[in-house]
Amino acid sequence: MSVSLLQPSFLMSKTRSYAQILIGSWLFLTAMAIYLSLGVAPLDFQQGGNSRILYVHVPVAWMSIIVYIATAINTFLFLLTKHPLYLRSSGTGIEMGAFFTLFTLVTGGFWGRPMWGTFWVWDARLTSVFILFFIYLGALCFQKLSVELASILICVGLIDIPIIKFSVNWWNTLHQPGSISRFGTSIHVSMLIPILSNFANFLFLTCILFVLETRLLILSFLESSITEEIEAREGIPKPSSLALFASMAEWLKRPT
């Protein structure tokens, strides 16, 4: 990536237009996803209305994994470059990923209660997703102590991603094997479209939050001095350490 692409003026000008496009698209996708999930998609003949939970559960499960991979990439880039934007992006990813993973577990529990007779079973897929949630929580806690510890945890935690993906193939689980693959899908198109619509909805929402976080990071340093920022955080252990502020100050002074 060209260094010029990470300059404040370039990012502020581009993210302004991107944010408007993303927000407009997200509002449209939200309305469409709700309409398709509640008004168009047919009920499963075995699950009844309970099948509508899957139109949300499946997309957020995908997002929990996608956000983790994106967070790991940002974490790795931060360790290589020490650029503050990568640190902020990884922090946003950890928060978003924890939310999506928790939402996955909760919606899965509500779906499983009438179908399996219980909110929770120690199924291989459930357990591996549960571990992913604790990896996110651990990274959130470590961020307050050491950015490096949080980064290492995120990188090591990548091993859980293929376990989540292939757990239904490696072990005998209550979850069925994947219904969507590069070879095709076993889901009827009337049910597939609402799932993909909700997935696009959550994906756009995540992109919006990443863009807004980028703008907020830049504005927070442009509108107040580095000294004031350090004093405001004095005594509060946060990943935004003195080194990060110095790095940000140097970055903002670079010629555009």
From Swiss-Prot:
Protein species of origin: Arabidopsis thaliana
Signal peptide: none
Name of encoding gene: CCMC
Transmembrane intervals: 21-41, 60-80, 91-111, 129-149, 151-171, 192-212
GO biological process: cytochrome complex assembly
Lipid bilayer topology: Multi-pass membrane protein
Keywords, comma-separated and alphabetical: Cytochrome c-type biogenesis, Membrane, Mitochondrion, Transmembrane, Transmembrane helix
Name of one Pfam family that matches: Cytochrom_C_asm
GO molecular function, one term: heme transmembrane transporter activity
GO CC field: mitochondrial membrane
Other noteworthy facts: A stretch of 270 kb of the mitochondrial genome is duplicated within the centromere of chromosome 2 resulting in the duplication of the gene. The expression of the duplicated genes (At2g07681 and At2g07771) is demonstrated.
Function (record text): May be involved in the export of heme to the mitochondrion for the biogenesis of c-type cytochromes.
Name of the protein this chain belongs to: Putative cytochrome c biosynthesis ccmC-like mitochondrial protein
UniProt xrefs under PANTHER family: CYTOCHROME B_B6 PROTEIN-RELATED, HEME EXPORTER PROTEIN C
Coiled coil start-end: none
Keyword Transmembrane helix attributed: yes
Family: Belongs to the CcmC/CycZ/HelC family.
Compartments where found: Mitochondrion membrane
Major localization class: mitochondrion
